[in-house]
């Protein structure tokens, strides 16, 4: 165990020393001494030395305005480098995640031990479907420029791990590391301007190019080797167990910056990047496929019997077509309208078929080893990414559709659609969906907002098939919300069979999800249309903000379970789409635990889940990390489908119902019922200041005024993470558990913890939150920033947190938090030494900026750096 971490710790101290050298060179010995003294005080403070803690507070309070920024930056950079060392450790020969792909092989052995036949395992493998949806919010807080440097630091750490390095090689690698650390130090870590949705889309494409492009075929190769070895099975070349979709440039819910034109632009960029990446692949194949022997069919395809190198000839033809495609898309991106040229690649089959013919011919001519090299990787990329690179989801809030149709029906003098009953709406929508004539008059001039809704549907209609993955309706409440989108698509000339996924996200909507879908399935026209396939999205963040984490997670479980049973009864294949974030308050949990804690049967229709902002970098930032993450997902799906978790016992359900009610009542009692809560929240956290951070393209609020309910879920969680109270991720949960213990339910809770992955994961997640929360820091924020009349509320919340930790330990039977996950505990402990000074500094900066009438750019800049640094320290933003 300790040896496992010693490699990581030595990398952390080496990178820390390089950073120290850089700071000394840039700012002199004095600043470095100050930083080093703060780090040592922080370490002693963490070890419980109260005298040193007071000294730490005084040192940071007495920094001059000129010293603030260098000190904040030093600790922020320490944390970035620590995260790199940790990410590298997870894939290094020393790290436990080095065994992830091996873990997959072990799982297959475990399944065989449980008497699953090779045939059953083969069927389960064939059903694996992983669709990861890349989203920008809460958006990666680190700049793309810095991320590239940190990725290269990772590469250097990997090179240093080779035992057989010559001295000069080691010297060169260390020199490069020094350069990268210095470059990072001299690069501004905070963006000066807010990214546009197109910037975000490009960030997504960069992840594909830098990591997924290599990582996906590499994972499939490893997975295939394990399957071959363990169950004598090869993944079919045409299998596409992994797909990527993006919300960047398609998610317009609450983001007025995402227009139809932006979506059109993002789709073109995506196709351009795909053509560019495939062109590189084909270029390699042109040089590799010099073989002459082929089947007669392939020779015919290459241009006849006279062609000496048929494989190369086919690759060259594709190269020409990809160049034509890339050039055409480049013109379109620049706004030049031109007719589609001859040879333009639109359909994946035009790229797939010639290359697959090469693959078959090589196999038939005894050149399997060549076929299974670069060519197989390219074929797998066509299946995973295709000519679209990533498909796009469109997301819009239901009220926008209602208002657009309302404007139309009033113009047509049919009445006001928005004021009709649900029955009237359905009658109107179904009549129009079955009508042969268009509904929209040619010369109608709607309002800008309505025009935008219709124009978005036109973009869908004009895009190549397979460019758009689904249309997600947020705040879906009734069947007409789904039918309305179908009608809008029909009127735009789009394919109305495009999956339309209602998103159920508040507590009430989750509780009503089954009834809404039942009514939808009862409509014969709808049942005929969907071909027995339905996608439903479950929202995690808004329900947690609405009702607290315990009530929300139970409502999510109940909704999923009810939908699974409804679809089984109705003969519909259900794909549940999980809108999770990286934080607990937004449904975050390690992938394996999260998937196994879902209701039985929830993964039969495949896994579709959002991967957000900074989590994309942690899980998919490097090809090796991608292999590891995909192995996690594949293993969890196999396990969940073959060894499903148990159906909850009646006693468990009763306890969960009680936990949900008690926790929701307590959560809402504070958040909505406590008159001082909102002023306390605004004073004790940097919520107001967060709005200034040029983070994502999306505004932080749905409406510019109002209380907690108008805040987006992400800033709400982000703000509480900053002051280390982590309130949204625990409030109500521990108190509800204690309530049930007091009601004599300890034995039932023990049974649930032991035998029910759903409950066990809830407890583990609470432990992780408690391990990251910090009472003394939260209290320090109160003392520096909150008016004295609000102190009792803060004290009450901290006491609640303290009591809750005891309640959870009574259930987990552990002596201390995270006893089962020493790796995570180690990781939190390692970062706390660097995060604590940033928290103290942030409270100091907030106090200075709020008491000074004029803004000081030094204070503002340092404040932004502490926000970024604490986010890196907590390893999640929102």
Curated annotation (Swiss-Prot):
Gene3D superfamilies: Phosphoenolpyruvate/pyruvate domain (1.20.1440.90)
EC number from the UniProt entry: 4.1.1.31
Superkingdom of the source species: Bacteria
BP terms from Gene Ontology: carbon fixation; oxaloacetate metabolic process; tricarboxylic acid cycle
Catalytic activity: oxaloacetate + phosphate = phosphoenolpyruvate + hydrogencarbonate
Active site: 137, 545
Cofactor: Mg(2+)
Coiled coil: none
Pfam families, per the entry: PEPcase
InterPro entries: PEP_COase, PEP_COase_bac/pln-type, PEP_COase_Lys_AS, PEPCASE_His_AS, Pyrv/PenolPyrv_kinase-like_dom
PROSITE patterns: PEPCASE_1, PEPCASE_2
Keywords: Carbon dioxide fixation, Lyase, Magnesium
GO MF term set: magnesium ion binding; phosphoenolpyruvate carboxylase activity
GO cellular component, one term: cytosol
Record NCBIfam families: PRK00009.1
Family: Belongs to the PEPCase type 1 family.
Biological role stated in the UniProt entry: Forms oxaloacetate, a four-carbon dicarboxylic acid source for the tricarboxylic acid cycle.
Name used for this protein in its record: Phosphoenolpyruvate carboxylase
Source organism of this protein record: Proteus mirabilis (strain HI4320)
The organism's taxonomic lineage, starting at the top: Bacteria, Pseudomonadati, Pseudomonadota, Gammaproteobacteria, Enterobacterales
């Amino acid at each position: 165990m300790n040896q496992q971490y010693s490699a990581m710790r030595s990398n952390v101290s080496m990178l820390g020393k390089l950073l120290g050298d850089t700071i000394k060179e840039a700012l002199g010995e004095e600043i470095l001494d100050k930083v080093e003294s703060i780090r040592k005080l922080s370490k002693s403070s963490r070890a419980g030395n109260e005298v040193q803690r007071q000294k730490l507070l005084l040192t940071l309070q007495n920094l001059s305005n000129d010293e603030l920024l260098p000190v904040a930056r030093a600790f922020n950079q320490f944390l970035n480098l620590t995260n790199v060392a940790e990410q590298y450790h997870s894939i290094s020969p020393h790290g436990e995640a080095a065994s992830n792909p091996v873990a997959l092989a072990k799982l297959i052995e475990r399944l065989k031990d449980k008497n699953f036949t090779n045939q059953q395992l083969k069927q389960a493998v064939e059903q694996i479907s992983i669709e990861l949806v890349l989203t920008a919010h809460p958006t990666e807080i680190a700049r793309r420029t810095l991320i590239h440097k940190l990725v290269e630091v990772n590469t250097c750490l990997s090179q240093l791990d080779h035992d057989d390095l010559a001295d000069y090689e080691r010297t060169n690698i260390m020199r490069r590391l020094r350069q990268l650390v210095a470059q990072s130090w001299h690069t501004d870590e905070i963006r000066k301007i807010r990214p546009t949705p197109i910037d975000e889309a490009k960030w997504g494409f960069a992840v594909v190019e830098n990591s997924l492009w290599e990582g996906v075929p590499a994972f499939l190769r490893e997975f295939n080797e394990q399957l071959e070895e363990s169950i004598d099975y090869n993944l079919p070349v045409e299998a596409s167990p992994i797909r990527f979709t993006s919300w960047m440039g398609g998610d317009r819910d609450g983001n007025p910056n995402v227009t139809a034109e932006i979506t059109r632009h993002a789709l073109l960029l995506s196709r351009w990047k795909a053509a560019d990446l495939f062109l590189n692949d084909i270029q390699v194949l042109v040089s590799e496929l010099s073989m002459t022997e082929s089947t007669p069919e392939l020779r015919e395809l290459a241009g006849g019997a006279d062609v000496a190198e048929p494989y190369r000839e086919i690759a060259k033809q594709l190269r020409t077509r990809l160049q034509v495609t890339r050039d055409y898309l480049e013109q379109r991106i620049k706004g030049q309208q031109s007719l589609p040229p001859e040879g333009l690649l639109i359909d994946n089959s035009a790229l797939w078929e010639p290359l697959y013919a090469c693959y078959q011919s090589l196999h038939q001519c005894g050149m399997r080893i060549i076929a299974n090299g670069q060519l197989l990787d390219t074929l797998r990329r066509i299946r995973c990414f295709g000519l679209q690179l990533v498909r796009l989801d469109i997301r819009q809030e239901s009220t926008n559709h209602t208002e657009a149709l309302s404007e139309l029906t009033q113009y047509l003098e049919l009445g006001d659609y928005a004021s009709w009953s649900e029955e009237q709406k359905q009658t109107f929508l179904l009549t129009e969906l079955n009508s042969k004539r268009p509904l929209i008059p040619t010369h109608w001039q709607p309002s800008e907002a309505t025009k935008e809704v219709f124009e978005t549907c036109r973009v869908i209609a004009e895009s190549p098939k397979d460019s758009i993955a689904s249309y997600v309706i947020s705040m879906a409440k009734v069947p007409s919300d789904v039918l309305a989108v179908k009608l809008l698509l029909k009127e735009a000339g789009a394919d109305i069979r495009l999956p339309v996924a209602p998103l159920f996200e508040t507590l009430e909507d989750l509780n009503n999800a089954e009834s809404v879908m039942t009514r939808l399935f009862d409509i014969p026209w709808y049942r005929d249309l969907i071909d027995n396939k339905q996608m439903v999205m479950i929202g995690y963040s808004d329900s947690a903000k609405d009702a607290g984490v315990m009530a929300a997670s139970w409502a999510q479980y109940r909704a999923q379970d009810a939908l699974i049973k409804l679809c089984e009864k109705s003969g519909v294949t259900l794909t549940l789409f999980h809108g999770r974030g990286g934080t607990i308050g937004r449904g975050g949990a390690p992938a394996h635990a999260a998937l196994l804690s879902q209701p039985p049967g929830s993964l039969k229709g495949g896994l579709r889940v959002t991967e957000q902002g900074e989590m994309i970098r942690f899980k998919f930032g490097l090809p090796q990390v991608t292999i590891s993450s995909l192995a996690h997902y594949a293993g969890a799906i196999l396990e969940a489908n073959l060894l499903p978790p148990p159906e909850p016992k009646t006693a468990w359900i009763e306890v969960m119902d009680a936990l949900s009610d008690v926790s929701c009542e307590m959560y809402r009692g504070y958040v909505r019922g406590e008159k001082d809560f909102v002023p306390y929240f605004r004073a004790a956290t940097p919520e107001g200041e967060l709005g200034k951070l040029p983070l994502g393209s999306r505004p932080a609020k749905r409406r510019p005024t109002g209380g907690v309910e108008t805040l987006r879920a992400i800033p709400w969680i982000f703000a509480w993470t900053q002051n280390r109270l982590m309130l949204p991720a625990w409030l109500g949960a521990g108190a509800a558990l204690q309530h049930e213990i007091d009601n004599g339910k300890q034995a039932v809770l023990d049974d649930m913890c032991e035998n029910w992955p759903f409950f066990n994961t809830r407890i583990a997640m609470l432990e992780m939150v408690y391990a990251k929360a910090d009472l003394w820091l939260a209290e320090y924020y109160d003392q520096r920033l909150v008016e004295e009349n609000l102190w009792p509320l803060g004290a009450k919340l901290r006491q609640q947190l303290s009591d809750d930790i005891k309640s959870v330990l009574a259930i987990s039977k552990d002596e201390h938090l995270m006893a089962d996950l020493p790796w995570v505990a180690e990781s939190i402990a390692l970062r706390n030494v660097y995060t604590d000074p940033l928290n103290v500094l942030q409270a100091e900066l907030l106090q200075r900026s709020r008491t000074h009438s004029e803004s000081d750019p030094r204070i503002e800049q340092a404040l932004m750096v502490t926000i970024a640094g604490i986010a890196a320290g907590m390893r999640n933003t929102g």
